[in-house]
Amino acid sequence: VWLWMEFPFHDQFGGKDTGIDLVARTVEGEYWAIQCKCYAADTFINKPDVDTFLATSGKRFETEFGMTGFAQRLWISTTNKWNSTAEQTIRNQNPPVTRLNLIDLENDDVNWSSLEQGLFGVASRPKPFAIREHQQEAIDQAHAYFKIDEATGQPAHTRGKLIMACGTGKTFTSLRIAENETGGRGLVLFLVPSIALLGQTLRSWLQQSQEPMTAVCICSDPQVSKQTEKKDNDTTSVIDLALPASTDVPSIVKQLQHARRHNAEGLTVVFSTYQSIDVISRAQQQLLAETGGAFG
């Protein structure tokens, strides 16, 4: 991560007020443009606030490997309030925009006091939840249900259903079941009916995971996932997910191939909505073809 003035290629953008505060390079070698805004909690973000950032981060620049551009743009602010025009402006952008608002910072998996004391990484994270008795019972019963039959070498069951009451920790329990059944190393598909639930599950699993986890998000079709009408029950958009979501098959395959090479000791989890099952199928077929059936 670089401060903007320390970014090796910042001089190609000209001017002082570029709207970009930080630049991050991912493990895949992609560049992210990041804007950080410290606002009062009751401040509304307006379209002019985002225009400069979008204009600058949309430009291409030359690196030692040739011309490139920002693959993703991240807006971080200490308010939850957005003018409707500003919110519409950051949707459907290319490169895409995601945002972290005050509510995300407050609920993030970070002990802010630890950061202020100079602690980073695992040392700054709160302790994971302890498994409760009823959750352990569910984990044990799921393991027994899917146990390998010694005679056939195959699981006794390939499908099952776990029913738990509201507030009993279904999301957390499902994570511990996935970790237990894969030994913390494997490829998991998690399907949900809405982007809101996808975002909730994604954050919970990343926060509570006991093993290294690579998450790949596949959003539903744009007309559903980017629905913003107030009358709609699910107003969550892909711009509010903790990680970028995509329906681009080559991009999804690239992420999974990278996870296969670099996360052999952890879980790779594909989070998706039901609407994107066709995208998952096409990505899986391409991945199996590229790996000779060894992964996917």
Predicted feature residues:
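Conserved Walker A/P-loop ATP-binding site and its immediately adjacent core
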Residues: 185-209, 214-228, 274-276
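Switch/connector loops and helix/strand junctions flanking conserved nucleotide-binding motifs
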Residues: 42-46, 82-89, 198-201, 224-231, ...
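Catalytic centers of nucleases
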Residues: 1-67
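Conserved motor-coupling elements within RecA-like helicase/translocase cores
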Residues: 232-268
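ATP-dependent helicase/translocase motor core
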Residues: 1-3, 8-12, 60-168, 172-186, ...
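SF2 helicase catalytic motif II
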Residues: 275-276, 288-296
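Loop/turn-to-beta-strand initiation segments
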Residues: 187, 265-269, 294
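Conserved two-lobed SF2 helicase motor
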Residues: 263-281
